[in-house]
Swiss-Prot record:
SUPFAM superfamilies: Metallo-hydrolase/oxidoreductase. InterPro entries: Metallo-B-lactamas (IPR001279), RibonucZ/Hydroxyglut_hydro (IPR036866), UPF0173 (IPR022877), UPF0173_UPF0282_UlaG_hydrolase (IPR050114). This is UPF0173 metal-dependent hydrolase M446_4343. GO terms for molecular function: hydrolase activity. The lineage of its organism: Bacteria, Pseudomonadati, Pseudomonadota, Alphaproteobacteria, Hyphomicrobiales. It comes from the Bacteria. Belongs to the UPF0173 family. HAMAP family: UPF0173. Keywords: Hydrolase.
Length: 236
């Protein structure tokens, strides 16, 4: 599997015939580099878009990318219905605890401790529960993108049920858990092959780097991968 980080919480997973974008926040993302050409490369051939929750920095370019590529959008029911009201037609609604078979892989929505909603005409529209997403494909590492969340004890159940090989962990503080708490979550609940930090280095009011997270996991035996933005890393 090739995993590409585009800054903030935006990722792409490439495996087999599947090309999966998660939280495709390009336009307006201060951490996204390379402009229109990089965006075109990031979305080229996308087959699916997974959205962890209904905030603008995670919904991002979903409508535009879906229109450009024909990618199927997979997210919670409420957010699917809202996107449908904006013209999206190719979507697969689900909810927390549910699993859907996308052909070459399965998606499960799991718990996240956060909020979700978008502002329209000065009114916040609730958009269902926030989630993490677990992606499982035959012969590929299982990936758990936590979305935006704090630590919670039932992460132990996520480990027991899904045994993720790759964790994508928010570390930026303020809107999610910070570096030390995120490191505690990794050490206490999981046994991954690799951990990738996210949700930092974008907006000035969250953490600027992953240094504190890396330091907090030093000596733990956990492999922390801090990718260069736009450059794929391969995890077998």
């Amino acid at each position: 599997m090739r995993i590409t980080w585009f800054g903030h919480s935006a990722f792409r997973l490439d495996f087999g015939e599947s090309h999966v974008l998660i939280d495709p926040f390009f336009t307006g993302n201060p951490a996204f580099e390379g402009g229109d050409a990089a965006r075109a490369r990031a979305v080229e051939g996308a087959t699916h878009i997974l959205i962890t929750h209904g905030h603008g920095d995670h919904v991002g370019d979903t409508l535009a990318v879906a229109a450009e590529t024909g990618a199927k959008v997979v997210t919670n029911y409420d957010l699917c219905m809202w996107l449908g009201s904006k013209g999206l037609t190719n979507f697969d609604p689900m909810n927390t605890g549910g699993t859907t078979d996308q052909g070459g892989f399965k998606v499960t929505l799991v718990r996240a401790d956060h909020s979700a909603g978008m502002s329209e005409a000065g009114v916040t529209v609730p958009l269902g529960l926030p989630n993490g997403v677990v992606v499982r494909a035959p012969g590929e590492p299982t990936v758990y993108h936590m979305g935006d969340t704090d630590i919670f004890g039932d992460m132990a159940l996520i480990q027991e049920i899904y045994r993720p090989d790759v964790l994508i962990v928010p570390i930026g503080d303020r809107f999610t858990m910070g570096a030390e708490t995120a490191a505690l979550a990794v050490r206490k609940f999981f046994a991954p092959r690799a951990v990738i930090p996210c949700h930092y280095g974008s907006f000035p009011i969250i953490a600027a780097s992953a240094d504190a997270f890396v330091a907090a996991l030093d000596g733990s035996g956990v492999q922390v991968v801090v990718p260069h933005k736009g450059t794929a890393v391969t995890i077998a």
